[in-house]
């Protein structure tokens, strides 16, 4: 089996894993690709009996070392079927290895849709849920909230079925499992009738963004909202989208792949110039922004199409990413501090930042579920910093990420599990009231640490 981010190194089976961005890699003992539950059971029982380590690997999109292991990688790509679809209960059951976009394609043909998605959909269903992916809407929670039930194979080969009604603690822990409790075999997810979205992009100044935020004219102004902030250009782009009935509004043609690739190439060229001559980075951001949005404020773009398609974003190229969830009421202060750092402080240490700062939101999950959800159990704002690697070159991203982390820590921020952060178990225990219960359950389910790795040891060990 050929997986793009996994390369065979030798005849003894060793492989090198690299994540999509090629920012993290590891040499593993081998790759296992079961097709059936019985094959999966044999792999896990062997690992459990012989002291082997296993980490499940999917599309490799996590911008961290959460997958990396010196043990064995386990790909569920061949366990990627739809198990059942039930329109009466508005649910679909799929095997864990299926990609999110594949689920949506099947649902769309049936006249249904996933309720909300993140920015990309090439990731596996189990990976999306296990790391607490989210979209951007105060009317929707993180994606694991929409899980109805799961079947999980433990390290000893036994299978546990859990839901809100059955094995409640197991379910609350496994909604965001970090791949540390067992291997998700299949998963039942809520669906909704298909919908289209009409989306607009509005250009505003940073000052006006904060004023509109204060007046509840941003996050409450549409069902789906996200904001991109361009600190050096003193601009923000507010993306809003609302549902309409399918095919009631003409669909906007998608940008051609050539145009996207060309834009990506030009973007890399600009950032590479900024890498070589760091002080010109603010001018490059202003130039890029003007080329894309012009000089005028107001509506810059309107598009319409199937909801799933409109919610997706084009992922340009290799990047480092850090994202933090903080209470929405504290977010304007936090964002203003990050903007001030970018404009006033980053250049003084020769560490100008890339653009944009992405800002998203979600509704709170109930207290008794999603123990490791990155929402704050109140309306939550996610602030994300991106530092690109133009033409795969190294970039000085750590000062920017430390600044964001220091700011987020002032509000007891929660880091995205699959992105870069430095918190330890002691710090995370203060922010996750149920983390101690999660850790105890993990030890009970996997006493030999089959699914443990360096990432988990660093942050939770």
Swiss-Prot record:
Cofactors, names only: FAD
Pfam families: ALO (PF04030), FAD_binding_4 (PF01565)
UniProt modified residues of type Pros-8alpha-FAD histidine: 61
Record keyword Oxidoreductase present: yes
SUPFAM superfamilies: FAD-binding/transporter-associated domain-like
GO cellular component: mitochondrial outer membrane; mitochondrion
Keywords: FAD, Flavoprotein, Membrane, Mitochondrion, Oxidoreductase
Residues spanning the signal sequence: none
Pathway: Cofactor biosynthesis; D-erythroascorbate biosynthesis; dehydro-D-arabinono-1,4-lactone from D-arabinose: step 2/2
GO molecular function, one term: FAD binding
Classification via PROSITE patterns: FAD_PCMH
InterPro entries per UniProt: ALO_C, FAD-bd_PCMH, FAD-bd_PCMH-like_sf, FAD-bd_PCMH_sub1, FAD-bd_PCMH_sub2, FAD_lactone_oxidase-like, Oxid_FAD_bind_N, Sugar_lactone_oxidase
UniProt keyword Ribonucleoprotein, yes or no: no
Catalytic activity: D-arabinono-1,4-lactone + O2 = dehydro-D-arabinono-1,4-lactone + H2O2 + H(+)
GO BP, one annotated term: dehydro-D-arabinono-1,4-lactone biosynthetic process
Location of the protein in the cell: Mitochondrion membrane
Domain FAD-binding PCMH-type, first and last residues per copy: 24-194
Enzyme Commission number: 1.1.3.37
Assigned protein family: Belongs to the oxygen-dependent FAD-linked oxidoreductase family.
Record protein name field: D-arabinono-1,4-lactone oxidase
Gene name tied to this protein: alo1
